[in-house]
Amino acid sequence: MKVNSDWNRERKVKFTIQDPCQIVRKGYGDAVAEDLRYVVKQVVGEENVIEMTPNKSNNYCCGGGGGFLQSGFQEERRAYGKFKFDQIIETGADYCITGCHNCHAQVHDIGHHYGGNYNTVHLWTLICLSLGILGPNEREYLGDDLKDVDVFHPETALF
């Protein structure tokens, strides 16, 4: 199976990318950020990717890592996350792609808390979408603009 962005050719849904601190900023650097972008562009279409500024190794932390999500300091976490929220909103993207669970939870939370108009989606959800398969639990991360994408639904297939 090969990924492709045909599902988004006419939709032109726009995506931005959250670079996880543990993997990019404090880990493997821009090389892995470039790998992430290569995959994302294959999956959603290069013309549908809007970069945050700054990005890659210089991207802002979302504020959800290092156990901060579970620390009990919700107000402080959200206040710190406002920088990331503003950065995402500035792109005008419909979705923020996250490759890290902590980032996903934080970006999703600050979006709802501050009234953002973007959805948060895991990278693997988009990979499944581009392959034409999507598990039942993955559809909950899609906004209304992607709920009707024609994909194979394994839970309803007849064997």
Label each residue range with its predicted role.
Residues 1-159:
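Iron-sulfur cluster-binding electron-transfer modules in prokaryotic oxidoreductases
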